[in-house]
Amino acid sequence: MSQSKPQFRTVEITLSAPFDGWTATMKAEGVPARVFIELQSGSAERALTALKRLVVKHNFLTDDGAPASDVLDAPMDALSDAITKWSDAVAALPPR
């Protein structure tokens, strides 16, 4: 019997002002336990590295207004808001 990869859900988040129009698609299921450990580590560097693993796509900008090719090039305030919005969105998902 061969294994198949489950179809995991994602959530769409929209950041708060002053990041109007900034959105991201983020993993809501199938997230490795290590990502949760890193988010709760108390280390900003480890938490941000974990955040990067959650983001599937985004339209974030750098501090000079250019598209951020790497989510970690976006302003810290935007990334903090993204983590909060992701947590709220995942908690609000109905059970399967």
What residue ranges belong to the model's regions?
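Extended acidic low-complexity intrinsically disordered regions
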Residues: 1-10
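Short, surface-exposed, charged amphipathic helix/loop patches that serve as local interaction elements
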Residues: 8, 18-96
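A short beta-strand micro-motif
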Residues: 11-15
